[in-house]
């Protein structure tokens, strides 16, 4: 179930403060955050946000197409190593 339209998009307050500082100072350094649940807002366009995936911070450059999505969608948490080889096929 999606979030109610009357509530509006959710974004953590500490992340909004960091974005305001970055846009006012024209700072190109990535904004480090653990908030994967925050929605990408139009103010984030053009910024690089380092989103934590449980192990490291993955840099995500925000474009216009990403607005409305969550930050966690762009930082993959699971690594796929491939399926085990079939032992019968090797013989």
UniProtKB/Swiss-Prot annotation:
Please give the function described in this protein's UniProt entry. Answer: Protein S19 forms a complex with S13 that binds strongly to the 16S ribosomal RNA.
Q: Name one Pfam family in it.
A: Ribosomal_S19
Tell me which PANTHER family the record gives: RIBOSOMAL PROTEIN S19P FAMILY MEMBER (PTHR11880), SMALL RIBOSOMAL SUBUNIT PROTEIN US19M (PTHR11880:SF8)
Question: Which named protein is this?
Answer: Small ribosomal subunit protein uS19
Looking at the UniProt record for this protein, which Gene Ontology cellular component terms does it annotate, in alphabetical order? cytoplasm; small ribosomal subunit
GO-annotated biological processes: ribosomal small subunit assembly; translation
User: Is Cell wall biogenesis/degradation there in the keyword field?
Assistant: no
Give the similarity note: Belongs to the universal ribosomal protein uS19 family.
GO molecular-function terms, A-Z = rRNA binding; structural constituent of ribosome
The protein's superkingdom reads: Bacteria
Gene3D superfamilies reported for this sequence:
30s Ribosomal Protein S19, Chain A
The alphabetized UniProt keywords are: Ribonucleoprotein, Ribosomal protein, RNA-binding, rRNA-binding
């Amino acid at each position: 179930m999606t979030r109610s339209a009357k509530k509006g998009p959710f974004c953590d307050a500490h992340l909004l403060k960091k974005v305001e500082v970055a846009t006012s100072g024209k700072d190109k350094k990535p904004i480090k955050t653990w908030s994967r649940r925050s929605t990408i807002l139009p103010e984030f366009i053009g910024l690089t946000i380092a989103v934590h995936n449980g192990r490291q911070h993955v840099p995500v450059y925000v474009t216009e197409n990403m607005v409305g999505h969550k930050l966690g969608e762009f930082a993959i948490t699971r690594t796929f190593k491939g399926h085990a080889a079939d032992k019968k096929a090797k013989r």
